[in-house]
From Swiss-Prot:
Its EC number is 1.1.1.37. Belongs to the LDH/MDH superfamily. MDH type 2 family. GO terms for biological process: malate metabolic process; tricarboxylic acid cycle. NAD(+) binds at residues 11-17, 107, 114, 131-133. One of its GO terms (molecular function) is L-malate dehydrogenase (NAD+) activity. This is Malate dehydrogenase. It is an enzyme of class 1 (oxidoreductase). InterPro entries: L-lactate/malate_DH, Lactate/malate_DH_C, Lactate/malate_DH_N, Lactate_DH/Glyco_Ohase_4_C, Malate_DH_type2, NAD(P)-bd_dom_sf. Transmembrane segments: none annotated. Pfam families: Ldh_1_C, Ldh_1_N. It comes from the Bacteria. It comes from Xylella fastidiosa (strain M23). The active site is at residue 189. Keywords: NAD, Oxidoreductase, Tricarboxylic acid cycle.
Length: 328
């Protein structure tokens, strides 16, 4: 057995948390040879804490061989203590009549506090994935609130968008998703994201040779991927939970265990690539090895793509400006 890993999960009794915890305990995130301690955080109210205790009871009843221990708490300093990985799933959802700027402010308070707690008690090499929306800006806030931690280790989840785009291409081409490579989702995890298959291949053949159809790209593919979350809410009455948890597993597994040379999409702090301001958390194509990621460099950006990338960048800049006063 490899060394024990401590993984903190916020919003642990929520729908995504419930879909995620059992898969982590089964070894799907860190490997089948890595024991885990789950450190679960929920809101400090009686109902949330009771639900969290129920989740813990179910985890006990699964008798997972790799589950070496559990912590349930409403205190971030306890949840993040010595954490090797932190999945920040919990966030304030948008309520009726709530403006986007109000949502940003409410979440800024949460992620400022969680970033500070990580800075105080987590391992110095902790790897952080923000799932709670608005994920990119929440990750940026947490990163800025943890000045003693490696900023490269604060990431936002765009893997759900990446997986959604893979599925749409698979259906269009009649090819298995496993045979499709070099897909990218640029930018913000929001409807402004830009799924880009210009470099993608299926069975090694460029996809643009099979789908040379800019109308389908602009009028079907991009809108379907970018509005998929809303379509699921309309159909199910609830937001994506199992698919979001699955994407979080994919993101962390590939980051920690390596992507074997394959391109994946991660929201990571920009190093200035593609004209994205340094430090902005932005969806890029990356490869991963030995627990670190590298942005795929020097891809040509055509006029069509630049229009979409500029739009998602403008949204992120607006979000960042709206919370800047909280980070001074």
């Amino acid at each position: 057995m490899k060394a024990l890993v401590r993984v903190a999960v916020t919003g642990a009794a929520g729908q995504i948390g419930y879909s995620l915890l059992f898969r982590i305990a089964a070894g799907e995130m860190f490997g089948k040879d890595r024991p885990v301690i789950l450190q679960m955080l929920e809101l400090p109210d009686e109902k949330a804490q009771a639900a969290l205790k129920g989740v813990m009871m179910e985890l006990e009843d699964c008798a997972f061989p790799l589950l070496a221990g559990m912590v349930v708490t409403d205190n971030p300093d306890i949840a993040f203590k010595d954490a090797d990985a932190a999945l920040l799933v919990g966030s304030r959802p948008r309520g009726p009549g709530m403006e986007r700027k109000d949502l940003l402010m409410e979440n800024a308070k949460i992620f400022t506090a969680q970033g500070a707690a990580l800075n105080k008690v987590a391992r110095r090499d902790v790897k952080v994935l923000v799932v709670g929306n608005p994920a990119n800006t929440n990750a940026y806030i947490a990163m800025k609130s943890a000045p003693d931690l490696n900023p490269k280790h604060f990431t936002a989840m765009l893997r759900l968008d990446h997986n959604r785009a893979l599925s749409q291409l698979s259906t269009k081409l009649g090819k298995p998703v496993a045979n499709i490579e070099k897909l990218i989702v640029w930018g913000n995890h929001s409807p402004t994201m830009y799924p880009d298959y210009r470099f993608a291949t299926a069975d090694g053949t460029p996809i643009i040779e099979a789908i040379n159809d800019q109308a389908w790209n602009a009028n079907s593919f991009i809108p379907t991927v970018s509005k998929r979350g809303a379509a699921i809410i309309e159909a199910r009455g609830l937001s994506s939970a199992a698919s979001a948890a699955n994407a979080a597993i994919d993101h962390m597994r590939d980051w920690l265990l390596g992507s074997n040379g394959k391109w994946i999409t991660m929201g990571v702090p920009s190093d200035g690539s593609y004209g994205i301001p340094e430090g902005m958390i932005f969806g890029f194509p990356v490869t991963t090895t030995n627990g670190e990621y590298s942005i795929v460099k020097d891809l040509p950006i055509d006029t069509f793509s630049k229009t979409y990338i500029d739009k998602t960048l403008a949204e992120l800049e607006e979000e960042r400006a709206s919370i800047a006063h909280l980070l001074r």
